[in-house]
Amino acid sequence: MKLKKLALSAVLSIAISSVYAAELPNITILATGGTIAGSGQSAVSSAYQAGQLNIDTLIEAVPEMKTLANIKGEQVVKIGSQDMSDEVWLKLAKTINNQCANTDGFVITHGTDTMEETAYFLDMTVKCDKPVVLVGAMRPATEKSADGPLNLYNSIVVAKDKKSAKRGVLVAMNDVVLGARDVTKTKHHRRTNIQFAKLRYARLYS
């Protein structure tokens, strides 16, 4: 009798979990590398190599994201964004356009050196009405004060919000949301390196 009750409880738990997962939006993370996926020899060292960690590792580091959406990760490339190329840009645009009907939004993990160029290119070439959000970090994932995990979590918040749709490609970093045509990198060492003109999170979602 006890075994039957345990079995029934397990079945109900699985069923409830399945229903809960079905109600969550589906978000696809396209990973390209960058500092957000960087790895250093020490948690207190500023020396690191960009694009070392794969997307599964980044997702596992922020389990809270799974309460926001059904997360699917896809590793596009593993590079520092200084090595970003036309080939990768085209691959990102084609991937988003091809998968648009099968997801509720996209997040692209990216280095900050060429994030503005990638955002602008995708803004002109992506033909998808779902949210497309770029996110990066100024400190590698292995550093004690890494900013990537919170930035990644916030990018999922933005990508799952229906108000983000049909606004063009966005950049979400440091608690602000930026339009692709308004973003530029101005500082190379501070976490508040990404600057913008006029377009703020409060304006988008007020």
Regions found by a protein language model. Give the residues of each.
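Active-site histidine-anchored catalytic micro-motif
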Residues: 22-206
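Gram-negative bacterial Sec-dependent N-terminal signal peptides
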Residues: 1-21
